[in-house]
Amino acid sequence: MEGTVTSNVSASGMGAITAVLMQLCNAGDHVVSSRTIYGGTYAFLKNFAPKFGINTAFVDITNLAAIEDAITEKTTVLYCESVSNPLLEVADIRGLSKIAKKYNIQLVVDNTFSPLSISPKVLGADIVIHSLTKFINGSSDTIGGVVCGRQELIDHLRNVNDGAAMLLGASMDSLRAASILKNLRTLHIRMKQHSHNAMYLAHQFKNDGIKTVYPGLESHPSHAIFKNQMNEEYGFGGMLTIDVGTLDKANALMELMQKENLGYLAVSLGFYKTLFSAPGSSTSSEIPEDEQKEMGFSEGLIRFSVGLDNDIKRTYLSMKKCMVSVGIL
């Protein structure tokens, strides 16, 4: 799927991420990372990796000049998400690849938010990571991760003497692997529907005057970059965010939508039902509030993982009723 020579599965997405970073970095090495990434990855790089002498500079991944300025002679890894969690910033993977090659560092891309829609390896990434838990499995009933890369890297990860994937123990069991493989066979169908539904909701929410962020909207700052990188038939992905002003309104809306069976208030994504959460107090809660504000988080931010609803117009009209009911519209 990602076009790499081989891959290695793990017991979780974080099992894949941490193994790669520990394999690529030694004590004294340096990482340049996007500042808007999954909270668990941020916590690992910010709080855990320094225990081993690995330090990280967090930068605006959309600012290529700032990224290049952050690179030092100790930098070994440039890390980003193809579409960031949860602010949906889009990485210019071709531009990042040029920088990585210029300084002989590894470009590692987490592609969890955009499987099939974006192919990081084709665009120049050295290593591609997924949380299999999300879109690829698609049914929120198991946990897994995968590292896709060159044979040499995967062999090193599996080495019984010094391989991080082997020695840290985050191995996937065979039953989980078989279950995910079964669901993988419908990913191409599911991603088209996720993208179709997300695009519809994004346009409707925007037309209603709600602050909406979705890479498929021309108003998105990186719309052109995503469009230039995408595999067109799979669309712009199933993730979008809206800002309803306050956390109280966000919680009231999510609770009412769940009550009306429009989806679930949950921190995962890629499920066949729509999932919604307030990232600042959930998936990004590891990031201090002052840093969240610097990154562009707001209290009223709601992240939607749009489901596979057959009648998305009906879903939207029901969501709009909920928004009117709680005073958002």
Task: Annotate each predicted stretch with a short phrase.
Residues 199-273, 287-293:
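Conserved small-domain helix->loop->beta segment predominantly found in fold-type I
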Residues 180-189, 237-245, 303-307:
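Short, well-ordered beta-strand elements within core beta-sheets of diverse protein domains
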Residues 135-141, 176, 267-280:
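FAD-binding core of FAD-dependent oxidoreductases
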Residues 46, 69, 247-248, 255, ...:
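PLP-dependent enzyme catalytic core of the Aspartate aminotransferase-like
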Residues 165-166, 257-269, 321-329:
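A common structural junction motif
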